[in-house]
A protein has these predicted regions:
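Chalcogenol-based redox active-site neighborhoods
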Residues: 1-154
Length: 154
């Protein structure tokens, strides 16, 4: 089970592909964001998902929503993944899996494996929506854009 909607997302700090540490509450103060957790750099599904976020980056950017990818891969792997796919957003390395566990994205029977889960957070880091069991990254992103657009209009 993912973290519940309307709960404040837990704070964390992880190394980022931008060369600095990312701290959720500090770096996203007064800014909405998407935290998307994924299993493995360069796997087919994760590559498709990253490319879908890349291809819709401008939509989220115009809505002032930051996209952040998180997996248990090393920073070296993340740097290669980001460069190869020309990703315009940062990736965070959770090599020990602590943040994946905190956000309940680990499979119970295979705790070293992260399941594809996306959290949409508002500017106060409250969870607005959760997407899990993602099989079609394009449908996932389309649904998220529709959800964000509705919430922005309110």
């Amino acid at each position: 089970m993912p973290l519940p909607i309307n709960q404040k997302a837990p704070d964390f700090t992880l190394p980022s592909t931008n060369g600095r540490n990312f701290t959720l509450y500090k770096d996203m103060k007064e800014k909405p964001c998407i935290l998307y957790f994924y299993p493995k750099d360069f796997s087919v599904g994760c590559t498709n998902e990253a490319c879908s976020f890349r291809d819709t980056f401008e939509v989220f950017h115009e809505l002032n929503i930051k996209i952040i990818g998180i997996s248990r891969d090393s920073m070296e792997s993340h740097q290669k993944f980001k460069k190869t796919l020309n990703l315009p957003f940062d990736l965070l390395a959770d090599e020990g899996g602590k943040v994946c566990a905190l956000y309940k994205t680990q499979l119970p029977f295979v705790p070293l494996f992260t399941k594809r889960t996306t959290y949409l957070l508002d500017k106060n880091q409250t969870i607005l929506a959760v997407y899990e069991n993602i099989f079609s990254s394009k449908r996932h992103i389309k649904s998220m854009v529709e959800n964000v657009t509705k919430k922005q209009a309110v």
